[in-house]
Amino acid sequence: LSVTYDGWIDLFCWGTGNCPTKVSTDIFSPDTAFVNFVDWGINQIGNDKPNTWRTLTNEEWNYLTDGKEGRKNADSLCSVAQVDGINGFILLPDNWTCPSNVSFKRGVAVGHSEKNYAEHQIITLENWLVLEESGAIFLPVTEDNMYSYGNENSEGYYWSSTLKGKYSPHVYAYYFEFDASYAGCMFNSTSKRLFVRLVKDVK
């Protein structure tokens, strides 16, 4: 993604891997609400075979970002930034070491608005490519239908593969959310349209 990108960025209702255009009415009924998760990785992605990629579980998202439930140094293995003009959240591998030829500020910003990403740090595309090579992952802020106010440049929402439960008249699933000063897992209706970020298991 970059400020000049003008292609499609898709949002999905939960678990619609085999039917990405389907929209749940979110009524407690097996016919209309999403209960059985179908991973988006069921599709062929690039030259990889179907089911090579998958969606992170709620437990995995928590491991990455929650120092109480996951890795103890989670707070120092994440950051926020404006990367090549795009606001977003950065995840770092366990035992990560910053490359010597770039500067990097760990942790999140003090404020939670759009401007706080750039105030925390600005990373050029050249430097980001170095960080990416070292294992850093960038999650751009997202558009969504979660709330009515505009947050397309300040917050991010990414589905997990974990169902929360059926509480009539709603069906809920977990998702990962962030702004410039916060990151964590929440749950909401499976009818919400959010981003997905797939991963590949290391063998």
Where do the PLM segments sit?
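A short glycine-rich, aromatic-capped structural motif
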Residues: 1-37, 51-65
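C-terminal, surface-exposed recognition/capping segments
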Residues: 3, 16, 42, 48-203
